[in-house]
Design a protein with these regions (language model features):
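Sec-dependent signal peptide recognition
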Residues: 2-7
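C-terminal motif of bacterial Sec signal peptides marking the signal peptidase cleavage site
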Residues: 14-15
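Structural motif
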Residues: 51, 220-222, 258-262, 305
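Gly-rich Lys/Arg/Thr-decorated short loops/hinges at beta-loop-alpha junctions or inter-strand turns
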Residues: 109-113, 216-229, 267-273, 342-346
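A Trp-anchored, charged/polar loop motif used as the substrate-binding/catalytic surface
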Residues: 204-207, 233-251
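Extended C-terminal subregions enriched in glycine
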Residues: 269, 273-320
């Protein structure tokens, strides 16, 4: 992550309101990494899926993150994936999607209204991929740098017509089969909780406990709402590594696991029109993916997907002036850019071309050969 932060000394930060163009100067980096494209796994069933979501991560955010580190020839960890596609992301009644509707599309495979979580536009229950996979003996984990009740993680376990009902969403997480959830949101979990039913941890050092594997469920709450970086909560990298380790060990005698890990605050930086904030969050996101790649290389049975719900901020990159790029924000809201998807591992070939965001759900199940999975209970 330091390599991103060291390159931001020339940033000129200013604030804006919607409709005002904001320019920021970003130094072109020199830490070039021209790693070879990762091998493509064809016609092989995936055992596990790790889905990375860069909230608010449009193509311009990816481009700026790359250029700020190593210039035109640099590649981010996921840009070496052998398969890429384009994802269209409108919601049920709007060209403009929010995170709730987009996450419902991946989690349940159906378009819904903005603000709805895994219920359709008529407020009818939609089974999610963790719920479907749990009947086959799979375990699921969620990681976020927001509250674990925020729209993206919540869509994988909550069924409700308002993403703002955090206390009820928190209850739904406790009632769910999610094996491990790490992020913020402690202010929403005021209900009595039995440590025997779900092990609660409130500081990052607890993630290093050797006995986490002894618990059937773990809930890590490292901030009242989103993670406040000034208070040094665990990084997305650390939370992702610990979630992967936990799920890998817990499913040693089970069919597999599903993990969603979100770089939530990439979006918040876009709303703030703050390049320095965005690149810092992006660095943690990219580091998390790099760690998952190392796991997948050894495991040989894990599909890694990297995508976004939408782009935020209307970020436009203008021609360099000397060694600086001009980064221009055009809105403090989401924009209508289509977003990319990157795939590596068994089943990656299913994610090429142009697809609707609901198709990600179907293709993930296809990669796992879901129709031929037998009913199972993961006993560990």
């Amino acid at each position: 992550m330091k390599k991103y932060l060291m390159l931001l000394g020339v940033l000129s930060i200013s604030s804006c309101q919607d409709g005002t163009l904001v320019n920021e100067a970003v130094l072109i980096g020199t830490d070039t990494n021209e790693a070879a494209t990762l091998d493509k796994s064809i016609n092989k069933k995936a055992k596990n899926i790790i889905l990375f979501i860069g909230d608010g991560m449009g193509p311009s955010q990816v481009e700026l993150a790359r250029l700020s580190v190593g210039g035109a020839n640099h590649r981010l960890s996921f840009e070496n994936f052998p398969v890429t596609g384009i994802v269209l992301n409108s919601s049920a009644q709007n060209l403009y999607t929010d995170s709730a509707a987009a996450a419902t599309a991946w989690a349940a495979g159906v378009k819904t209204k903005n603000g709805y979580l895994s219920v359709d536009a008529d407020n009818k229950f939609l089974p999610t991929i963790p719920e479907l996979l749990s009947t086959k003996g799979y375990l699921t984990g969620l990681v976020a740098t927001s509250s674990v009740t925020h729209a993206t993680p919540a869509a994988f376990y909550a069924h409700i017509n308002s993403r703002s009902k955090h206390k009820r969403i928190a209850e739904m997480l406790v009632e769910s089969d999610i094996a491990i959830a790490l992020g913020g949101g402690s202010e929403f979990f005021k209900m009595p909780l039995s440590n025997e039913a779900i092990h609660i941890i409130n500081n990052g050092d607890s993630l290093d406990e050797d006995n986490l594997i002894e618990y059937s469920r773990v809930l890590g709450l490292f901030g009242e709402d989103g993670l406040d970086r000034r208070l040094s909560p665990p990084t997305q990298l650390k939370m992702t590594e610990k979630a992967v380790d936990f799920l890998d060990l817990k499913t040693a005698n089970c069919p597999g696991f599903f993990l969603m890990s979100e770089g939530s605050q990439i979006d918040w930086a876009g709303h703030d029109n703050n390049v320095k904030y965005m690149l810092s969050e992006f660095a943690d996101f990219d580091d998390s993916i790099a760690a998952a790649i190392e796991f997948a290389k050894k495991d040989q049975e894990t599909l890694i997907l990297v995508t976004a719900d939408h782009a935020t901020g209307g970020l436009v990159l203008q021609k360099p002036r000397g060694s600086n790029i001009r980064a221009q924000w055009t809105t403090t809201s989401h924009d209508l850019s289509p977003i990319n998807i990157y795939a590596f591992g068994p089943g990656a070939d299913l994610f090429s071309g142009v697809m609707d965001n609901t198709e990600i759900f179907d293709r993930m199940l296809q990669a796992l050969d879901y129709e031929n999975l037998e009913s199972n209970n993961c006993i560990n």
